[in-house]
Amino acid sequence: MAKDIIKYIKNINRKPSVPRRLLEQFIAKGASTIPELSKGIGVSLPTTTNALNELMGQGLVREIGKKADSAGRIPMVYDLQPTAGYFVGVNPEMDCLALAASDFCGNLITEKQKVPYVYENTPESLAEMGKIINVFIDNLPIKREEILEVCVNVAERVRPLEGRAYNMFNFLEE
């Protein structure tokens, strides 16, 4: 399922599309009704409804209930589906790693701070980071296959006069 979601998201990200703009709107504004979404992205109600149904069919968006404070016809409220996929973030520091996992809505599932690790520009250090990340993933309350992305923040410095960036693990460039 995660591979299908990744493929779908990559496909809608190739060009500006209504489903993509709806996802951006949900990320920025949270739960919304169809009229709010339509106004937020500047397209008609039928176009918004079609794109929303497409996202729901992909399992990325869900109906969460009715808007309670509305007069007249009570509109349905939609939001991102938290279980559509998960993300893992890794932030290496010189003497440790910080790792976190979040759901599709950005809600933190778990995090580990100050995991002992020596950040060096060596293949061994990179392999050790991979092992730590794999252990972290194995201990998550979700299946590995449900993880959409693992992002590692790799520090770098830039020499503006040369227009060159130097980062850790530059032995991979050789």
Question: Where in the sequence are the language-model features?
Answer:
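Extreme N-terminal segment that seeds HTH/winged-HTH DNA-binding domains in transcriptional regulators
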Residues: 1-39
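Short glycine/proline-centered loop/turn elements that form peptide/ligand docking sites
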Residues: 11-16, 29-32, 47-50, 54, ...
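N-terminal helix-turn-helix
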Residues: 31-63
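Short, Lys/Arg-rich nucleic-acid/phosphate-binding segment
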Residues: 64-76
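Gly/Thr-rich phosphate-binding beta-strand-loop-beta motif of the actin/hexokinase/Hsp70
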Residues: 74-111
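Glycine-rich phosphate-binding loop and adjoining helix at the ATP-binding site
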Residues: 117-174
